[in-house]
């Protein structure tokens, strides 16, 4: 008797999902550090869905944006919950994104060039999306953050000033800026979603790394039910943690200054972005020259794109003690940069920021080429 194949293997659309998420051959020794990718997918969908409901009640106008946020919080049924899930979900998304990138660096996953480059592109687009979302509540930090960050474009020779005024839609941040940021903040997550699918396709065509860094083609197991059940358990745990934060301290990841309505006549004592951009902000302000600070910030992201091209290695070297020392030094330095970014600009933090900026580039360059150093020693 001929046994009919399951529908998931024959249907022209369902079999694509089946090959990516169900019958996917997966190395049998993946650790919990390989969970972040699936969690990122879930925590990308959550802000998209909640953002759709928020957009139904938000008004992108200078005189109404701040009031519309409070309208959502107080008047819309469960609006407060939708907003807090959206905001804290975005913070969790960036936590998982940094952990996902750190795992990729630790296990030298950037030798999968297409996968790594698309992943870095997703990170950049996510940064742009989150920045625009930070502006929409139209609080004090929203206004002055938009003014400071968009002003960086004035460092572009000849075109800079015109480009800034074109983005603003005038001679200062105003209604046109808010409208444009609202539209882009709505559209960009769908671009991230499309890039994530391409990221998955390239990853599964090349195969994944594993903790040992060895070829795992000899023994693989299907993704479902072995890893899908593990991912689901971890997802439920993290969802519980997020809900505890939402019900206990929903403003944990937010700045208190942004609870004040935007005021062009009053500047905050310390203008700073969301916590997940503080490390980049430290690099920007560590250089006393405006152009130098912007270039430093650009190169800090660009160097991630260049990792597959500047690295010299023949196999995974995450087992090396030198590499472990370099990697964890890099992690500690990133945490220091993040901490300094939230501190006021005083001589002590300026010196620490400049030192940490220098170490950021030095460590990442040595780490990417440490295999050569080991071979030569």
From Swiss-Prot:
Signal peptide: none
Record-listed a ubiquinone binding positions: 204
Classification via SUPFAM superfamilies: a domain/subunit of cytochrome bc1 complex (Ubiquinol-cytochrome c reductase) (SSF81648), Transmembrane di-heme cytochromes (SSF81342)
One annotated GO molecular function: metal ion binding
Transmembrane segments: 36-56, 80-102, 115-135, 181-201, 227-247, 291-311, 326-346, 354-374
UniProt keyword annotation of Endoplasmic reticulum present: no
Keywords linked to the UniProt accession: Electron transport, Heme, Iron, Membrane, Metal-binding, Mitochondrion, Mitochondrion inner membrane, Respiratory chain, Transmembrane, Transmembrane helix, Transport, Ubiquinone
Binding site for heme b b566: 100, 199
Subcellular location: Mitochondrion inner membrane
Gene Ontology annotations of biological process type: mitochondrial electron transport, ubiquinol to cytochrome c
Gene3D superfamilies, sorted: Cytochrome Bc1 Complex, Chain C
Similarity comment text for this entry: Belongs to the cytochrome b family.
Protein name: Cytochrome b
Organism: Myzostoma seymourcollegiorum (Polychaete worm)
Phylogenetic classification of the source organism: Eukaryota, Metazoa, Spiralia, Lophotrochozoa, Annelida
Protein's gene: mt:Cyt-b
């Amino acid at each position: 008797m001929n046994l009919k194949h399951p529908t998931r293997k024959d249907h022209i659309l369902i079999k694509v999902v089946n090959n990516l998420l169900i019958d996917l051959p997966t190395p049998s020794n993946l650790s919990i550090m390989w969970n972040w990718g699936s969690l990122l997918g879930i925590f990308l969908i959550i802000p998209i869905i909640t953002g759709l409901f928020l957009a139904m009640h938000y008004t992108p106008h200078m005189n109404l944006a701040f009031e519309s946020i409070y309208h959502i919080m107080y008047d819309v049924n469960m609006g407060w919950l939708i907003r807090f899930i959206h905001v804290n979900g975005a913070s969790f998304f960036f936590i998982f994104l940094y952990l996902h990138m750190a795992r990729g660096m630790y296990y030298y996953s950037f030798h999968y060039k297409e996968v790594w480059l698309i992943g870095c592109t997703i990170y950049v687009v996510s940064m742009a999306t989150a920045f625009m979302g930070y502006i929409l509540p139209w609080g004090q930090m929203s206004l002055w953050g938009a003014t400071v960050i968009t002003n960086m474009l004035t460092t572009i020779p000849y075109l800079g000033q015109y480009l800034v005024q074109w983005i603003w839609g005038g001679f200062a941040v105003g209604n046109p800026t808010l409208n444009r940021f609202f539209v882009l903040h709505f559209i960009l997550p769908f671009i991230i979603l499309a890039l994530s699918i391409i990221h998955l396709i390239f990853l599964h065509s090349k195969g994944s790394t594993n903790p040992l860094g060895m070829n795992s083609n000899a023994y693989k197991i299907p993704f479902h039910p072995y890893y899908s059940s593990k991912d689901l358990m971890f997802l439920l745990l993290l969802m519980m943690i997020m809900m505890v934060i939402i019900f206990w301290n929903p403003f944990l990841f937010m700045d208190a200054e942004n609870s004040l309505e935007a005021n062009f006549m009053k500047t905050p004592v310390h203008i700073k972005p969301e916590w997940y951009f503080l490390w980049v902000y430290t690099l920007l302000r560590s250089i006393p020259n405006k152009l130098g600070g912007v270039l430093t910030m650009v190169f800090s992201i660009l160097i991630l794109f260049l990792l597959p091209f500047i690295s010299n290695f023949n196999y995974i070297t995450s087992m090396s003690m030198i590499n472990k020392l370099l990697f964890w030094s890099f992690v500690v330095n990133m945490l220091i940069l993040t901490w300094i970014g939230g501190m006021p600009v005083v001589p002590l933090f300026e010196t620490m920021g400049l030192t940490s900026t220098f170490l950021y580039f030095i460590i990442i360059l040595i780490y990417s080429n440490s295999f050569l150093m080991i071979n030569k020693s």
